């Protein structure tokens, strides 16, 4: 009975008894409940069919017990990974796969999708082992997917007696907090009573992290065998993790065409937008900043209106690029493949949470264009598998040798692969007898990762726009080939003058922040595109001044090669100087015979530097090259603090560390 009909009956029969009224109320409530229940039943299929099972490595909340999975499948090895770019996840997969050789059936697990308190139950599984492959990210932080685990292990006081573990860290020595996360987790697990089975391994991405991992791994397994009393090991057998399923009859609307997780997410956009659900932002400006010199630097403006994404000056924007179509076609021809074949790669381990290496079903063309790093330098395990597809024994031995841990093999890999910047396409072009099936290539190559850029605008001025400042990466290799940066080449082609163009993006929050009090003075060091976040800072300080706020000194040290060629945003910066918002210090390294860099200017301005960071307790920022510039600037600061602040070197170093803890010293650097 409808609510409208109930109202009619009541008006016509005003003398109903109490019982009649009570019955009517019951009927009304019942009808409402039935109506709402029916609607929920009708809506349920819409939700379940429009949101596809995620195809990245995740476990649903009802399947987050890794202990149950280990016990149910007779496994004793679990390898957790904390990964931002995919390398730690790749290493974890390789360790779990190799466990079979040593009679340890393993599984890979994402700590973000697991109940990590179950580590306490590992002791209930005989001869069990937990391995942690953990990257350090940003300013000594855990990766996004390891954050909760890191906080839990830091703040918790659990008893992990009976847990056997090992840790391998991924870091970069050019950064101050080298492998901080892995070092801490290794130490903390021992403090909580766990047993270290093998020594901490540390990989350096600035050198050869692949070599570091292999060297550690090849000593790790013998120690594991000794610890658990495992005698001997099986032969090394190359096994496929995924099986091929060609699907010519799949309906076109069920095929992934570049979506990160949810099918049709690019056509049917809905917030919140993040790494698994990027927003398609329109490119509204794409202009050249360099006025000469042969290099290219782009100023790009993206429209994020309607996305509900918010950003602050200093945040990063991540962009999902696509691979060069020419390279994709080349790879298809080298593998003698029909790139438009629809297929799925299905994990042979039915208990794994990672059902596919990337969204499936899809086509080879889409996989190679949107999902796989075809321009990356292949790691040694890929060469080992490629060797099996060589018809020429010399080629097979050559690849196997480069994949080995012998000094000769390592040297060949360094020279022929790394120093020559050979990617998978180049390898197959140069080794004519190597013709692997395209599906195995898709299994071996790592996932194409988003590229991160410092946002070069302030949301105070541009709440619905995000600005990017990026140099086009392009260089000639020793083999005579021209390698191009995946993301910057992709952006270079996005010209809004030829029609609407969009790119998939999301915002990543940062700790790189202006002082909360505008009157605090700041010093910024940003040569080249290191200027990017400071452009946003300066815009914001100007905005505050225009609004009547008191704003402290805003000092920028900027450097480039030549004033008339690559002095980016020159007119803007000079305008800020004219109106009193900015003090600008410039170094043009090639405009005179003797090169001048920003580090020279900072040394010359020792009194000013000390006044701002020592006497006025101002903030100091660095953005740019981590390997040389950032290290040099930090060393100069130590000297300035020693001489002007009357400190010894140790005290000066501690002063900078104190500034870091107070968020007065911040670095946004890359190598």
UniProtKB/Swiss-Prot annotation:
A cellular component term, taken from the record's GO annotations: cytosol
Task: Please state the Enzyme Commission number of this protein.
Answer: 1.6.2.4
Family statement drawn from the similarity comment of this UniProt entry: Belongs to the NADPH--cytochrome P450 reductase family. In the N-terminal section; belongs to the flavodoxin family.
Query: Keywords on this record?
Result: Endoplasmic reticulum, FAD, Flavoprotein, FMN, Membrane, NADP, Oxidoreductase, Transmembrane, Transmembrane helix
Q: What is this protein called?
A: NADPH--cytochrome P450 reductase
Q: Where are the transmembrane segments?
A: 15-35
* Ranges facing Lumenal side: 1-14
Q: Which InterPro entries match?
A: CysJ-like_FAD-binding, FAD-bd_FR_type, Flavdoxin-like, Flavodoxin/NO_synth, Flavoprot_Pyr_Nucl_cyt_Rdtase, Flavoprotein-like_sf, FNR_nucleotide-bd, NADPH_Cyt_P450_Rdtase_alpha
- Cofactors that this protein relies on: FAD; FMN
Which organism does this record belong to?
Answer: Musca domestica (House fly)
**Which classification does the entry list for the species?**
Eukaryota, Metazoa, Ecdysozoa, Arthropoda, Hexapoda
Domain named Flavodoxin-like: residues: 77-221
